[in-house]
A protein has these predicted regions:
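Catalytic cores of enzymes
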Residues: 568-970
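Residues that mark the junctions of alpha-helical repeat units in TPR/alpha-solenoid scaffolds
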Residues: 35, 70, 77, 112, ...
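N-terminal leader/linker segments that initiate helical-solenoid repeat arrays
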Residues: 22-64, 68, 75-83
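Conserved alpha-helical positions within TPR/SEL1-like repeat arrays
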Residues: 40-48, 76-90, 117-132, 159-174, ...
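Alpha-helical solenoid repeat scaffolds used for protein-protein interaction
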Residues: 292, 304, 311, 322-323, ...
Length: 970
């Protein structure tokens, strides 16, 4: 969490240890008639965070009534000064709050109460005011002193120490010691959670602040636990509290940290609106929420928006929030770099570095972070010596402050080693890289296997940098291993899960149990996402039902694991991630077969060409910020052609296509490709949405039909397929023949106008699919013929067609799909967020006459994943079936991942909306080619080349028509 000083929330206001001794000093028989007692009771009934001005008046009355007594109680007066300090703090006046706390301290000391609970609380709160004014070092000193007092009084485990552990944790966090801070603040938070009433507003504020701090130390699950509990308490007891937006913003931040950015945006936007209304635009909490929204935007690839939001989150009076200012400048610099604004990125980072040097101690963690970011940008601009010095500064600070295996420290070592290599210290640098990267791998795998988190690309950048270093240091085997680690995403995990079922025996009890266990893990991820959305919307009862379902599913998982371990003792070994050694992969490749690896990072793009008899490697100077616009340009020229409605299609962007080819296939790689007839592709980031077949290997003159037909497309040189898992490369797909069991599904009964553009705006009503709108989608006249021709190519004895009114969700879900080795869907494909209300990709089937539970005409990703398949090949002749959620999303997410998980070993998908005549031509020709003995990749290549050459097909030579399909896992 950015450094909004909220350790005091609930700590200044809540525990009231001094009040215990103060009350006991008053005669019980007279307490009811005592004006001082009445004043205190009235003051304690007012929420200091929700109504600070009213609370201040009430607590000043407590002081006045005490001073009117013959013998004023010093502890009660000290307590009142503490509470008044609360009210001033909540109104942004920590300097005035400090004076109140100093008055309390001096009063207690003069009364001989310098070692009691009230003094401990006062010192703790006083220290927090120091941090609020930019003095965290003195805060840490005061917090340790306050904690020592209470330990002496009560021992280290007494719950009355919660305030001290909590405030010490926050002080350590602001002082730049996140790991020790997380230990202390988590202990204090759990103590408070166990002892405080759920309707006490201090509790939800405690949980929210703790969530932000433990998340920054890498404890993602604990952060989500605390944040979700905080939102639940707000929704239940304090929906109109002025800090409700703050709590929601913390939940959004923790969701983003867990790789759940799409969910986080909804929560955080609500937080920004609530905070702006209750606190004002310049309030630190509002600015913090704006910064968190920027992070979520960036995770979805929206870097310009993210940079603008981040700069907006910087306070006008930067000096008053120095740590926050530097953090925001670091973040804005990163976003500028990712958006291709390199000069701006350096300028912002230089500003942050200079500001931190003036305002922060030399060994502060934020100094390390800003030096790290500036070093990366300077390296990219060729300033290697200064970049190395800055990265050495970063590593030295992290080595002093963080655990030896903390992700930040290990990441800094990877980058430091890379810079040492760049500065000529090759052996020393690579030893550092290898040691750090190897320690990070188990951490990444643990997160990927966790049901609440799952595989993501959060470690991508560090392993990509390690791969670059390995290439530069001459270690191609290690570079290949690091590429696999960087690319360990949901599809690799799905392929691994299918392999586990196969190893257990496809028809065995063990395989069924393994599938049930994997389904339970998938269900847990869905339930956790649902819970976050319910909490964001204030649905307390729904969130509680989710909790019950989560607990039930976790118990089921534990039971299944126990049963599997009994009947399949080797299961644990099978469940470990598999990283394929370079030599093993080479041994699987045929002489004319190669694997091409491309990994864009923020600094450069590393590429490898692996053949049976050798490896070629190169590092391109183009970072992903340069690669992404080129991919976008190619895709935009295709989209323009698709949307033109003209017989003669608009020009293809040959310049961008060739620029990409030149960047990805430099001379070193091209020299190794001679004689290849088949190339497996393992490309990440935006390259996953690139139709490699449409790269031109030579510059093209002209833009017309002749230029398109004569262009030297990469597909002319070799067949192409995309690999999901290195374990399957070179293994060879199962050949198909006329005896293959085939299921053709599609040509749904729709009533719209054929050929009319799809109108999506009315598909959903109140968050659910409108079956009438689904039925009104345009039919696909060629789909029936397409499926029939595939069936004819494969033979009819073991084949079936499910079309028209029969092609419904109910039919598909009740079919025994495991008996078909080839399955084809010919229908519309919809991607998530293409229409409001559609939260996941879907295939369109025939909708029911009336809406019913579980059947609305859309076969979604979740429903596809629940199918039990045993297919060698699934063909999705539909729109956008290869689409991921963003440029930076794991490759081929959505429908592809669902079919892989369901039990598919190979897929034919479309990158974009496929013209009906082209879809039929390409898919049928590919199936016919495979039935005649060609491998799938070669069959697809020949189908593409035939379409390019056929002058009878309008626009057939344009990649928009012939290049939509991609073969995955061939």
């Amino acid at each position: 969490m950015r450094g909004v000083a909220f350790a005091v929330i609930g700590l200044l206001a809540g525990i009231g240890y001094g009040s215990v001794s103060a009350v006991s000093a008053w005669p019980l028989e007279s307490a009811a008639q005592d004006p001082a007692a009445d004043a205190r009771k009235a003051a304690e009934a007012i929420d200091t965070s929700g109504k600070p001005a009213e609370a201040e008046v009430a607590w000043r009355k407590v002081i006045a009534t005490q001073q009117a007594r013959p013998k004023p109680d010093p502890e009660t007066i000290a307590l009142a000064h503490n509470r008044i300090g609360d009210t001033l703090y909540y109104r942004g006046k920590p300097d005035l709050a400090q004076k109140e706390l100093e008055a309390a301290r001096d009063l207690l000391a003069a009364a001989g109460l310098g070692e009691g609970d009230m003094m401990s609380e006062t010192l703790s709160n006083l220290g927090t005011m120091h941090t609020a004014q930019g003095r965290p070092a003195s805060d840490v000193e005061l917090q340790r002193k306050a904690l020592a007092m209470r330990v002496k009084l009560h021992g280290p485990d007494d719950t009355r120490l919660a305030i001290n552990y909590y405030n010490l944790g926050y002080a350590l966090y602001e002082f730049g010691q996140p790991l020790e801070a997380a230990d202390s603040i988590e202990l204090g938070t759990r103590m408070r959670l166990a002892t405080m009433k759920p309707d006490n507003p201090d509790l939800f504020l405690t949980l929210a602040t703790a969530a932000g701090i433990v998340e920054s130390s890498g404890r993602v699950l604990t952060a989500i636990e605390f944040a979700q509990k905080a939102v639940e308490l707000v929704n239940t007891h304090h929906p109109k509290h002025p800090y409700a937006g703050f709590v929601r913003g913390v939940l959004g931040k923790t969701l983003t940290g867990a790789g759940r950015s799409a969910e986080a945006i909804e929560v955080t936007r609500q937080a920004v609106d609530e905070l702006a209304a209750s606190m004002g635009e310049e309030n630190p909490l509002t600015l913090d929420a704006i910064g968190n929204l920027a992070v979520s935007m960036a995770r979805l690839g929206r870097f310009d928006e993210a940079r603008e939001l981040t700069m907006r989150s910087i306070p006008k009076k930067r000096e008053e929030r120095a740590p926050d200012t530097v953090r925001a400048l670091i973040t804005a610099s990163n976003y500028a770099g990712e958006g291709g604004r390199e000069a701006e990125a350096i300028a912002i980072a230089e500003d942050g570095y200079a500001f931190a040097a003036k305002k922060m101690p030399p060994d502060h963690a934020i100094r390390a972070q800003v030096a790290f970011v500036l070093a990366i940008h300077l390296e990219r601009s060729g300033q290697l010596k200064r970049a190395l010095e800055l990265m050495q500064e970063t590593a030295a600070i992290f080595a002093k402050r963080e655990d030896a295996e903390s992700p930040r420290r290990l990441g800094a070592d990877v980058y430091l080693g890379g810079l040492e290599i760049a500065n000529g210290l090759r052996q020393q640098g690579y030893a550092r890289v290898a040691a750090a990267a190897d320690k990070m791998a188990p951490k990444m795998f643990a997160i990927a296997q966790d049901p609440a988190l799952g595989a993501s690309n959060s470690y991508y950048e560090t392993f990509a940098r390690a791969a670059e270093a390995a290439i530069q240091a001459g270690h191609p085997g290690d570079a290949f291993r690091y590429h696999q680690l960087a690319s360990y995403d949901v599809n690799v995990l799905a392929s691994q899960q299918v392999a586990m079922r196969t190893a257990a025996g496809r028809s065995s009890e063990a395989a069924a149990l393994v599938r049930d266990l994997q389904d339970a893990g998938r269900t847990l991820r869905v339930l956790n996402r649902q819970k976050a959305g319910l909490l964001a919307r204030g649905d307390v009862e729904g969130a509680r039902r989710s909790d019950a379902s989560i607990a039930e599913t976790e118990a089921k998982s534990a039971q299944l694991t126990g049963r599997i371990e009994v009947i399949a003792p080797g299961f644990e070994r099978l469940s470990r991630p598999e990283i394929v050694p370079l030599a093993t992969l080479q041994s699987r490749l045929a002489k004319d077969e190669g694997l091409f690896v491309a990994m864009p990072s923020r600094s450069r793009t590393s590429v490898m060409l692996i053949r049976r008899d050798g490896v070629k490697v190169a590092v391109s100077a183009k970072p992903r910020s340069a690669i992404r616009p080129l991919v976008t340009a190619v895709r935009q020229s295709i989209d323009t052609a698709l949307n033109s409605g003209e017989t003669t299609l608009p020009p293809f962007d040959f310049a961008a296509s060739h620029a990409l080819y030149a960047a990805l296939f430099p001379a070193e790689i091209r020299s190794g490709a001679t004689g290849l007839t088949r190339l497996h592709l393992a490309a990440t980031d935006a390259l996953a949405s690139l139709p490699f077949a449409a790269l031109v290997t030579q510059p093209v003159r002209g833009t017309g039909d002749r230029a398109l037909r004569d262009a030297r497309w990469l597909i002319r040189d070799m067949s192409l397929d995309v690999t999901v898992s290195m374990a399957s490369v070179g293994a060879g797909g199962t050949p198909i023949s006329r005896a293959t069991a085939f299921a053709g599904i599609g040509a749904p009964a729709l009533t719209g106008t054929p050929g009319k553009p799809i109108e999506l705006a009315g598909l959903f009503r109140s968050g659910r699919a409108d079956v009438r709108a689904v039925r009104g989608l345009p039919p696909l006249p060629g789909a029936m013929a397409e499926l029939s021709q595939m069936r004819a190519a494969l033979g009819g004895e073991r084949s079936t067609l499910v079309t028209g009114a029969d092609a419904s969700e109910a039919r598909i879900k009740t079919m025994d799909m495991s008996q078909y080795s080839v399955i084809a869907f010919a229908t519309h494909g919809l991607i998530a967020n293409q229409v409001d209300g559609l939260e996941e990709p879907a295939l369109v089937l025939t909708p029911p006459n009336e809406e019913s539970v579980g059947e609305d005409g859309l076969l979604t990703v979740s429903e596809i994943a629940a199918l039990r398949l045993n297919a060698d090949w699934v063909i999705l002749s539909a729109c956008n079936t290869a689409a991921g959620s963003t440029q930076s999303a794991p490759s081929y997410t959505g429908l592809a991942h669902a079919f892989l998980y369901a039990g598919t070993r190979s897929l034919l998908l479309s990158h974009w909306q496929v013209r009906d005549d082209a879809a039929s031509r390409l898919s049928v020709a590919t199936v016919r080619g495979t039935a005649s003995g060609l491998d799938r990749a070669q069959a697809l290549r020949q189908a593409m080349l035939a379409l390019i050459a056929d002058r009878k097909v309008p626009g057939g030579a344009h990649p928009a028509v012939w290049a939509p399909f991609v073969l995955i896992g061939a």
